[in-house]
């Protein structure tokens, strides 16, 4: 799978940043940063949130660069691959009750892309036990309007993954279309740091209450902000300063 993804990425180098990130990918320098998602009231860890990082200390997000659309898709698929490998490691090393289900942010468009369709099919066929502990956290806006394609995809994910989340941000125009696909959880990518941001959050808060969604507060930066999210009804949270992401690297990946 690793060699397949590297081969796919090399075909889609367009920008200088594409080349930079590809070189890191090829040399196994792209890692997952793992961050706890906690229960809002108890603080107990319920899930692990995984994003891609690279650099000497794994401090740089790969998505901070100017990447072509297809290279971003390749990285999304690579992120899913790393989640499968981490989950497989847990299955082999720990008792089933101790396994942490892992949340992977991924663009809907990456999974509707022809190579993404193939990758998902291979994942379900050959890595089903690991995929059962993965939670795709889907990112989309305009694509949500293509209800038939997205419905087919979400049905497949619900049947094979642990559960299905959707991400909602204040920048999204079509976030209410998420309701068409009955997500198990909503992950909010918003902040409450100033009056303008809190005002932008109101339509999303109304949307969540209307559909009685269980939701995760992301980007929580302080105890004060966490308390606000608790009052607003958040069931889970992540991003708090006490949970600095830890980079994970599996040097044996290139053997696959």
Task: Tell me the role of every PLM-derived stretch.
Residues 112-125, 145-153, 173-185, 229:
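Distinct, well-ordered alpha-helical segments
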Residues 56-81, 108-114, 126-161, 190-207:
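EAL-type cyclic di-GMP phosphodiesterase domain
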Residues 1-29, 33-35, 41, 53-54, ...:
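EAL-family c-di-GMP phosphodiesterase catalytic domain
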